[in-house]
Amino acid sequence: MSDILVVEDEAIIRTALKRLLERHHYQVAEAGSVSEACERHNLDNFDLIISDLRLPGEPGTELIRRAANTPVLIMTSYASLRSAVDSMKLGAVDYIAKPFDHDEMVETVQRIIASGSSARATAQNIR
């Protein structure tokens, strides 16, 4: 079972995303900001971090730097597509527009986690 951290300041969105992912057999932890995520969790223990771009305090892209070994999927509104591209340049593994389509979110998560598992297996075989 894969572990996912959802960082979203809007409780309704955070809860909906958690339920969606749990229905697909993911273990989900939550935080409402970057600082809360860092204080409550070891970011390297997750297979994926899904974060809103605009959060109170620091932007979601700060998690890319703080969780260098964990892929970060950025969620953004349609109005901030330019910010999504900038997030990718900073190292986000992908972005998804809000409001997100449930099937698209699950497919994106599955793809990222499968890709990460393959990369980890390859790295272990090289050692």
Show which residues each predicted segment covers:
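Acidic, metal-coordinating helix/loop segments flanking the phosphotransfer/catalytic sites
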Residues: 5, 30-48
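Acidic catalytic/metal-coordinating carboxylates
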Residues: 33, 59-62
